[in-house]
């Protein structure tokens, strides 16, 4: 439903970067979820996987899923770092994360804006720097071949997710030649 999509895209507190993914059918659910977990680990950002009632209750015979090497590798901080900065400004936008209990890896985590060490800050410079960092990690990441499932050619595109994908694919094939070319 459109409302679900709007909440997933815009329903978080503040300007927090997050990922929204959706399977296109029953056979795509496992791969989409694996990819969401991998991206959440790599980008240190929440990932939302959209589904719908039909996909959740469907029974289908599908091919055994491939076991692709989707490994979410965290940027980890070295042990014993003297000046650990949990939210360090890095070229990739992803800061090294200390495993809990790592010597020298303590930091403050709360819901307020902060500087590189995690200390809450109301300074405009800290806010601007951290917002740019959050944006850059989504923009600079290589999402690979799974980024989007786009079929067709044309200037118009129909965006869909979940169980609506099959009927829309069929409708576009029936419109072929009678309507402007569209992508799905």
Could you say what each language-model-derived stretch is?
Residues 14-22:
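Short beta-alpha connecting loops at secondary-structure transitions
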Residues 25-26:
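A generic structural motif
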Residues 32, 37-184:
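Flexible, low-complexity linker and terminal segments
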Residues 1-15:
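Flexible glycine/proline-rich, aromatic-decorated loop/lid segments
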């Amino acid at each position: 439903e459109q409302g679900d999509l709007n909440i997933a895209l815009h329903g978080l507190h503040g300007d927090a970067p997050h990922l929204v993914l959706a399977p296109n059918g029953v056979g795509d659910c496992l791969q989409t979820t694996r990819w969401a977990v991998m991206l959440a680990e790599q980008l240190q950002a929440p990932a939302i996987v959209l589904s719908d009632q039909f996909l959740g209750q469907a029974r289908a015979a599908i091919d055994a899923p491939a076991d692709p090497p989707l490994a979410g590798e965290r940027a980890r901080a070295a042990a014993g770092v003297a000046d650990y900065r949990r939210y360090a400004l890095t070229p990739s936008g992803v800061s090294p994360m200390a495993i809990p209990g790592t010597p020298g890896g303590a930091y403050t985590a709360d819901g307020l804006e902060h500087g590189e060490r995690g200390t809450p800050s109301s300074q405009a410079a800290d806010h601007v720097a951290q917002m740019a960092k959050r944006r850059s990690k989504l923009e600079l990441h290589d999402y690979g071949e799974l980024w989007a499932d786009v079929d067709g050619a044309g200037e118009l595109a129909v965006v869909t997710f979940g169980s609506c994908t099959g009927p829309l694919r069929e409708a576009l094939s029936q419109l072929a030649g009678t309507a402007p070319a569209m992508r799905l």
